Curated annotation (Swiss-Prot):
One of its GO terms (biological process) is electron transport chain. This is Ion-translocating oxidoreductase complex subunit E. It is an enzyme of class 7 (translocase). Keywords: Cell inner membrane, Cell membrane, Electron transport, Membrane, Translocase, Transmembrane, Transmembrane helix, Transport. Its main location: membrane. One of its GO terms (cellular component) is plasma membrane. Part of a membrane-bound complex that couples electron transfer with translocation of ions across the membrane. Belongs to the NqrDE/RnfAE family. PANTHER family: ELECTRON TRANSPORT COMPLEX PROTEIN RNFE, ION-TRANSLOCATING OXIDOREDUCTASE COMPLEX SUBUNIT E. Signal peptide: none annotated. It comes from Klebsiella pneumoniae (strain 342). Its EC number is 7.-.-.-.
Length: 232
């Protein structure tokens, strides 16, 4: 159980692919102009990570070490092709918005990296959980960045959600504030870099405060027995 918890915590926070490893920067910065696009690509990446980790882990005993990387790439490309066709069939608007970044998941360092570092060494269930956790960590980072850029740039949230979830999702659109002229800096790649930098700074502050709290707690625990011994 502790190993399962560690895999989840590592994927979502401690080893977040976007905020710690800084992998997959190209789609992270290019697609996160809206929350819908960010969520769509994040979920697609999560599905690919989960399925590829599961498949590669299941076949690891029969995969020759000398040609493992080409085999991994073939498996990843097959899964990405299936996901791309599903998005094309059931979310065509999102498919048009994401464009080339769906097939580019094949070359994403996150997917290949988890296949080599984790799935090739662990069991199928734990590997699938690792892929899901890493994918959801990246999805959360994409979604926060996409929401931030969309709100600052257009004053809206979940604009175009119907392209991902269907026509009923039009009701999810929120106009945070009205603007006649979009804030282009937030919508363009420089705004993505600035937003990502802010997210990295916030994560660093949270981690530092957590370390300080743990250090204070450890000192308090170490001082308490000394006091008891002194009184005795």
């Amino acid at each position: 159980m502790s190993e399962v918890k560690d895999v989840i915590v590592q994927g979502l926070w401690k080893n977040n692919s976007a905020l710690v490893q800084l992998l997959g920067m190209c789609p992270l910065l290019a697609v996160t102009s809206t929350a819908t696009n960010a969520l769509g690509l994040g979920l697609a990446t999560t599905l690919v990570l989960t399925l590829t980790n599961l498949t590669i882990s299941s076949l690891r005993r029969w995969t020759p070490a000398e040609i493992r990387i080409p085999i991994y790439v073939m498996i990843i490309a097959s899964v990405v092709s299936v996901v791309q066709m599903l998005i094309n069939a059931y979310a065509f608007g999102l498919y048009q918005s994401l464009g080339i970044f769906i097939p580019l998941i094949v070359t994403n360092c996150i997917v290949v990296g988890r296949a080599e570092a984790f799935a090739a060494k662990k069991g199928p269930a734990l590997s699938a959980l690792d892929g899901f956790s890493i994918g959801m960590g990246a999805t959360c980072a994409m979604f926060v960045l996409g929401s931030l850029r969309e709100i600052l740039g257009n004053g809206t949230l979940f604009d175009g959600a119907d392209s991902l979830l269907g026509s009923w999702a039009k009701v999810l659109r929120i106009e945070v504030f009205h603007t006649d002229t979009p804030f282009l800096l937030a919508m363009l790649p420089p705004g993505a870099f600035i937003g990502l930098g802010m997210m990295l700074a916030v994560k660093y502050l949270i981690d530092e405060r957590s370390k300080q709290r743990k250090a204070r707690a450890a000192r308090a625990v170490s001082v308490a027995p000394a006091d008891v011994t002194g009184k005795a």
